[in-house]
Amino acid sequence: MKVSLVVVCHHSSRVLSQCVESFRREAAAAVVDAEVVAVEHSEDAAELARVEAIGVDRLLERPNRGYAAGLNSGAAEAGGEVLLLANPDIRFFPGSVSALLDGVERGFDVVGPQFAWDDDGHVLLPAAEDPSPRAEFGRTIRRRSPRVWSATLGRVLDEAWRLWTAEETLPVAGLRGALLTVTRETLSRFGPFDEGYFLYYEETEWLWRARRRGARLGFAAGARVQHRWGHSIGQSDGAADREENSRRRFVARNYGPMWRRILRASGGSSCEPMQVVRLGDETGVPQAENDLWLASQFPHLVPAIGTVRTGAMPAAFLDFCRARGWVMASAKRSDGKWRITGAWTWAGDGV
């Protein structure tokens, strides 16, 4: 079997080498032929040379028409029966490629990994949200209503626990687009990515389209992959506007008039549904009895990054949260029910 890693790059050479090296190592461990196809969007000769020096098998220089266009170009040129469609700011942990391929062999049409924030793979990124209009309405109401938030907290944490503690590939309603594993036949069946999305929501739209046509999406819990998101876009001017424009395009094209009216009517500012203790700038998070540590930029904790039974969050991640005024929360499961045992933030005037 030949497996092609298709990577869309934009001034990404400083992170691409780890992506390529770790992929080749894990492809060898999985005993498959490996190919790396890089689509370079920087339109910069020096950057093109740096990517070429990394040793990719195919280097495609293309004008920057967006991430979806890059994926389509790379997939068309790739020679593998299985394609890993990827951001460059990822690193494969041991066993990850084997676990992704196992998910495909088990009959899932699209398979994604468990993403981790840190080098050790302990701080876990949240699974992708269900993009259906009904699920989006539920999230909107939870953000606005403390009563609904409390009533649905257990279900939200149960799902996080189900995925973060799993070992096999599980069915899910959505996947994160930093790495998607598909066969060439699957990509042909569901069509190319919509190049009307320059950045953000292109994978959401493609997965929603595939799911509505019967695709099975698999979350390969045994495939752990580090994702250092934002290396290229970071906090660049216009990033938030681009994401919002893509979101609006997705809603306009995929939700019917009734759902669009419902979501507009239910929108509004988020609530703070639990007591959050505000800490001094240099104060650490107190110890707490828990099964999950959760961290989110939102007071309602959705979505949340987390760790499972680690005792404490890694210091580097605490510093990350402190610098951004994120909310940290401790959650304990007892007799099948969840409760928040503490919540803290470093934000001075609200979260």
Describe these PLM feature segments.
Residues 83:
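Short aromatic/hydrophobic "clamp" motif used to bind/position activated sugar donors
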Residues 12-27:
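Short, well-formed alpha-helical segments that are part of the catalytic scaffolds
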Residues 93-127:
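Conserved donor NDP-sugar-binding/catalytic core segment of glycosyltransferases
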Residues 61-78:
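Glycine-rich, basic loop-to-helix element that forms the pyrophosphate-binding segment
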Residues 207-277:
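Active-site-adjacent helix/loop segment of glycosyltransferases
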Residues 130-172:
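Short, flexible, basic/aromatic active-site loop/helix in glycosyltransferases
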Residues 22, 38-48:
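A conserved acidic beta->alpha catalytic loop
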Residues 165-167, 173-191, 195-224:
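A short, conserved alpha-helix in the catalytic core of glycosyltransferases
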